[in-house]
């Protein structure tokens, strides 16, 4: 048996929800039926008190803690999957995650994840909560992630992340021609009807994204972005909110929109790019044990490079026709 502790805060946007429904949104790695069972087994504490009624209403701001024993045979299995290691020492690991690679098992992805790979290559990491995973990247977002190999390292990294002391920068291709950089400061929460989606919501958690223009193409803009917070799908939601969704992001409206008279090469490149154009390109943090300031960069993956080259070639071919 292994004991795990889950903790979270009910969001104001969840006002009026059933407790089991709210927990299912806060802990998407666990099914609603399992969470309901834990509630009924007196394992869920709300503001320090046991609540064992799944239909109990929540109001926002409540502190949730769940302490539960999980059978070993229900824990995640080690799998011999490759990891692209950028840096490693006794305390931390930095990887460059490829596309089509889920970080943590969940509904529909019980195996084949970064976590499964970590358990195989680093068996001792099973003793660290979430196998040392400090932050996540979406399945089809590529780039840098830091992993804690020990509990002290994870505790410090999580604290630094919460205090916004870890710098994460991304490159992206956004739909539309943007004229200047800026900042999106809009709170976010789970979408009220689509549980797997996030949305800008006035009662959500604070979320801040900074962005600047690197390059303009016809119909698209290449961006460098910096996260001040790290909400699920934050960059994708924020860019869609300002009417510039990421190219290829089917969830938030980034369906490819080829420019007028686009070449067949560009058309084919856009058709072949079947994910959001987002890459975690830079990670900077203070080492959790030594305090040394460390920084890593991950080159753009091949499909992203090919996309940029095709957009650039199209722009150069038609630049005499442009008025910007």
From Swiss-Prot:
Active-site residues, record numbering mapped to chain: 138
Gene3D superfamilies linked to this entry: Pseudouridine synthase, RNA-binding S4 domain
Organism: Pasteurella multocida (strain Pm70)
GO biological process, one term: enzyme-directed rRNA pseudouridine synthesis
Protein name, UniProt field: Ribosomal large subunit pseudouridine synthase D
Gene behind this protein: rluD
Any Pfam family matching the protein: PseudoU_synth_2
One GO MF term: RNA binding
Intracellular or extracellular location(s): Cytoplasm
Catalytic activity: uridine(1911/1915/1917) in 23S rRNA = pseudouridine(1911/1915/1917) in 23S rRNA
Any single Gene Ontology cellular-component annotation: cytoplasm
Domain S4 RNA-binding stretches: 17-90
